[in-house]
Amino acid sequence: MDDVATMKSENANLRKIQSRLLQWEQKDNPLAPLSSAQNEFINRLADSLTGATSPGANPLMESQELSLECKTTLVDFKNSGSVIDSTQDFLSWYNSIDSEILEHYDDVYLDYYGQLKQRSVECDKLLEEIDVSLESLQKLTNEYKFVSEKTSSLHQASENLLQDQTKLNEIGEEIRRRLKYFSQAESIYQRLQNPTFSVSNDTFVEILNTIDECLEYMRVNPGFSEAFAYGVKYRNCLSKATQMMRNYVSNILTNATAQILGPQRSETGMEQGSEAAFALYYGKFQASAPRVKRITGMIEGRLDRSVEYEQLLAALHQQFLANRATIMSSGVEQAIRDLSKKHKGDHCALVRSACAFMVHVCQDEHRLFFQFFTNSSPQLTAYMEGLCTILYDTLRPFIIRIDHLETLAEICSILRVEMLDEHVTYNPESLEAFAKIVYQLLQDVQERIGFRAQNYLESDILNYRPSAGDLAYPEKLEMMESIALSLQENYLRRADSRSSIVSMTSLASQEVESINQQAEQASKSRASNSPADLHGMWYPTVRRTLVCLSRLYRCIDRAIFQSLSQQALAYCIQSVSNAAAQISQKKTSIDGELFEIKHLLILREQIAPFRVDFTVKETSLDFSKVKTAAFELLQKRKQLFALGSNNALLEFLLDGTPQVKEQLLDSRKDVDRQLKMVCEMFIKDATRQLVGPILNFIDTAQNHVKQSAASGSSQPGAKQQQQQGLALRMAAFAAPQQISSIIQESIRNIKTKLGALQRSMQLYLANKDTEFILFRPIRNNIIGSFVKLEQLLTTNSYSKDDLTVVSCPSAEQISVLLSSVNLSGTVGAEPFGGIQRKISASSMGGNGGASVKPPIEKKVSFDSGANTVVQIEAGSEAVEVSAEEASVEEALEGKIEAE
């Protein structure tokens, strides 16, 4: 099998070789195609071979022919009739035949030899021809090399010539390019000198570009010959061109200005919103804007090339704005003057209309400027400030003469809110100059407000002289309450009459009844408010202070407001205190104190919404040490020039330096402090009004006991204690009958005066939580006075019979009495008797006569986070009450939380 496979593969290879050999000599697409020269050479060789082989034939063919000839000879011999009779004949014939055969046999070789010889000669000739051809080829090769060398050298020389030509062309082009910057000066200058040449011509831009390029070239190449001279020429050309542009723009602006300032201007006033005025003052300039904008655009695009363009643009800005100032100044001044006449007496309307007019003028001028120019200019802001200064010069005399704070506050609001916040915020670029002038006006208004506010605070608050009606308390409150009750009754009667018309059985009647009930409850809740809560019932200085602060809050800066608010609140507190003192003189101290408490609460409540710190830092110098140091210096005169550490002068300089003291003044704390003090006074006066006899007796008894103890200090210890215990009992004013009468008098005061006190508190305060907070320490002081009296009697040898005669009520009995004796049965959210106390003489016996403090402490949460505990003195009894409860503001908000 392997042999068969091998044979197959060999046969396949042979076939492949044969096919490839056949493909060598294919006429179409041979494997080794010959060139035309090669084919011609082969054909020539084939022809020469064909000619050489044609005379002779192949030796084998000749031998065959020879054999044929021999056969022919034998045949001819047979046919010739020759007779061989003898051996001699045969031998002769044979020899002849043999000779012929030999001859014929040698002829073949001779012929072949001759052919070979001929071929040798031909080969020699061919070799000679080949040698000749080789010589010719060698000669041709040498000649080709020679020609190639010559051609290469010629080509290299041509390339060198071309390079030299290119280099020379480049040098010539560079020379022409450089000479271009020098050769155009005269032609440009002649064209600029041509009177018919205009700036509006299209070639003017090309001339400007050429001048800029030439100047830049001279600047970059200062070492070139005559570069400085040609730079001067081109600068002269540039000056001529800029002068032409300046004259061109100036003529356009001057013509537009002359047309506006013509006779038709007097017929058209510059009124706000006038279309004719806008067309007159802006139409001519807007029509000229495209021609000027083309020139200014070229200038603005070349600002970085030369200083002349910057100077030219600044001159054009100045020319444009000067023409606009000539047109607008008198017009704006006349328009504002007309507005001042139109709004004479109404300063707010004048400020609003004049500022609105200037806003439109500034926006129009800004828009017109950018129709002529692309970039802004500081001169535009200065020009706009000049126009707005007319507004400032017109309005400032009115502002500095305004005395009314509300008018000044309204003007301040107009300038700050309407102008700065609304207009300037949304158009900051066009209204930049207007904003500066308005800010100056605002500062003037604020300064005027501060000055007038100080005068107002001094004249109308601090030095306010109340009329009889202002101090008619509580008559005013009672009258307003009666009016409110009458209005409430009328409202209820009308509601009852309306509800009686509708049938009570229908669904509609039930709805009407529910509505009437809700209205009745609402009317009752409204009627429960005190007339003192009405804005018109506030004391005038309180109302004026709050109105003044509300006006100033949004008008002036925070630092100025803090200073003025500190002064205003101090003056208001002093004014309210003076009014309360006058009410106390005319009526009672309770009325004066309740009046002051109510208005201080109003003041504290109304200043709470102001989101500003009412704290003001005051800096002062303390010279107290200077006096001491000077005195020591006089005592140490001998040590003035001492060289040691005891130099008196040095000590004076060190110790006598004034100290800088900083003090924080908080208006809110001043109000709280004054409110706390007034509440303490009210609690003290109310307590003395109800249990004054008991408090006076306790003070007298304690003084008597102290005097007895001082006089009996020389006695023995036991006897001294016995005499001290009997000293009060033996005194005439401390007899049980006298003490009993004092107690009865105090109880009568409680029964007769407590209702009036609660009535006054309800009338003035009109807040049950506030009334409850104020009444609680009074209640505790009353109970504490009876408890203290009981302790005093127990510790000073009063017998049970004496105590029976005295009949001092216990704390529970006084609590029940206070709860039963009130105006409406409840004060505050719960009855006054809701606070439970269990204090009696027996319960105090285990305390060794120590003073018992009623459990009345409460905790109140404040926004400020302060929980300071203060002492409110009422008689001789000290009761702890938080400062927040004394200020009672958080009680009004219902944030009281029992501890």
From Swiss-Prot:
The entry's keywords: Golgi apparatus, Membrane, Protein transport, Transport
Pfam family, one: COG3_C
GO cellular component: cis-Golgi network; Golgi membrane; Golgi transport complex
GO biological process per UniProt: endoplasmic reticulum to Golgi vesicle-mediated transport; Golgi organization; intra-Golgi vesicle-mediated transport; intracellular protein transport
Compartment list: Golgi apparatus membrane
Presence of the UniProt keyword Translocase in the record: no
InterPro entries in the cross-refs: COG3_C (IPR048685), COG3_N (IPR048320), COG_su3 (IPR007265)
Membrane topology, as annotated: Peripheral membrane protein
Main subcellular localisation: Golgi
Superkingdom of source: Eukaryota
Family designation: Belongs to the COG3 family.
Its job: Involved in ER-Golgi transport.
Summary of subunit composition and partner proteins: Component of the conserved oligomeric Golgi complex which is composed of eight different subunits and is required for normal Golgi morphology and localization.
Official protein name in the record: Conserved oligomeric Golgi complex subunit 3
Gene name of the record: Cog3
